[in-house]
A protein has these predicted regions:
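Short, small-residue-biased leader/transition segments that mark boundaries at the very start
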Residues: 1-2
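Stable alpha-helical structural segments in soluble proteins, enriched in small hydrophobic residues
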Residues: 19-35, 138
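Active-site-proximal beta-alpha loop/turn segments in soluble metabolic enzymes
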Residues: 73-84, 108-124, 153-166
Length: 315
């Protein structure tokens, strides 16, 4: 696809259009994979293949739901299981408990954009308490069996240098303190987009403070862009990257971003988008590129479940 990119001649592929270029890139990569290998997930070699740990959306907020919760996603990671089948089955038990608890409180059990519930809870603390209680009621242990990840999507509540979060206006340092308190109290694995993508000094601060404890994931910060990732690595902004094919526009560049991240001890998280199809290519690519994590919604909606089904077939 490099020749096609060179013909386009623009940094953001605006001449031919990123969607058109990505469609061609995907079609070529699939054809090449099936012509030379038995499957797409074998296209980058057969040694040290892993099944990524799923980050399953259980509660939606922010722009993905019609409620008062400012954080966009609350996810659970089934880390203490011997197989993907066992991990997903255990996750289903936790989700069932969440639904039961919401119904007992007469709260909405409709689903958000990515398959998680979208109840109108009072705060992020209410959501985290609900998730932890549901894990324990299912017979599992916090930290041993499940951890929690957040997508703060902080750019959505950032304005004029302040984070307008749950009725309060916070400076960068104050917002970092909010995250520190969360990490002290709950089994947090990662926080995505904890700060605004242009709050560069803030990213350095939060990485210094929380980086040794959790994964700080750059989505808006990096947008799967190799140059932005290089800057983040050099400046010590975040320690993980969200990988989205249609942000960068070609499979080749996506693989290069993952390679750069891996070489610099950044975790790569293969990700869906909020608007999805039933195509399961990202499941294959996550395995092929040895991504340790995959983020593709909840165990609901066919466009999300299709990715998990493909991972199950691979496993």
């Amino acid at each position: 696809m490099y020749k096609r990119q060179d013909l386009d001649g623009t940094e953001n592929k605006s001449k031919f259009g990123a969607n058109a270029i990505l469609s061609l890139s995907l079609a070529y990569y699939k054809a090449w994979s099936y012509s030379n290998f038995e499957a797409i997930f074998l296209s980058q070699g057969t040694e040290n293949l892993i099944i990524p740990v799923p980050m399953l959306n259980v509660i939606n907020g922010g722009q993905h739901a019609d409620n008062e919760v400012d954080f966009q996603e609350f996810m659970i990671l089934p880390i203490g299981f011997n197989s993907l089948t066992e991990a997903l089955s255990s996750t289903h038990s936790v989700i069932t408990n969440i639904k039961k608890e919401l119904k007992s409180r007469s709260l909405n059990t409709n689903l958000g954009d990515e398959g998680g519930f979208a109840p109108n809870l009072k705060s992020h603390l209410d959501v985290l308490d609900l998730i932890c209680d549901s894990i324990l009621k299912a017979g599992y242990k916090l930290n041993d069996h499940f951890k929690i990840s957040l997508d703060a999507a902080s750019s959505e509540f950032y304005s004029n240098g302040k984070y307008n979060f749950e009725g309060n206006s916070y400076s960068t340092d104050e917002m970092i303190s909010v995250y520190e308190n969360i990490c002290d109290k709950y089994p947090i694995f990662s926080i995505e987009d904890a700060l605004n993508e242009e709050d560069y000094e803030g990213w350095v601060k939060i990485t210094s403070k929380l980086g040794p404890k959790i994964r700080l994931v750059g989505d808006d910060l990096f947008v799967t862009n190799i140059q932005k990732l290089k800057t983040g690595i050099d400046e010590k902004q975040a320690n993980s990257i969200l990988i989205k094919l249609n942000q960068i526009g070609t499979v080749t560049e996506t693989l290069e971003a993952i390679k750069l991240a891996t070489e610099n001890n950044f975790a790569s998280i293969m990700s869906h988008r909020s608007g999805e199809t039933e195509d399961s290519f990202i499941s294959d690519l996550a395995v092929a590129s040895r991504c340790p994590l995959i983020k593709t919604g909840s165990l609901a909606r066919s466009d999300r479940v299709a990715k998990y089904n493909q991972l199950l077939r691979i496993s």
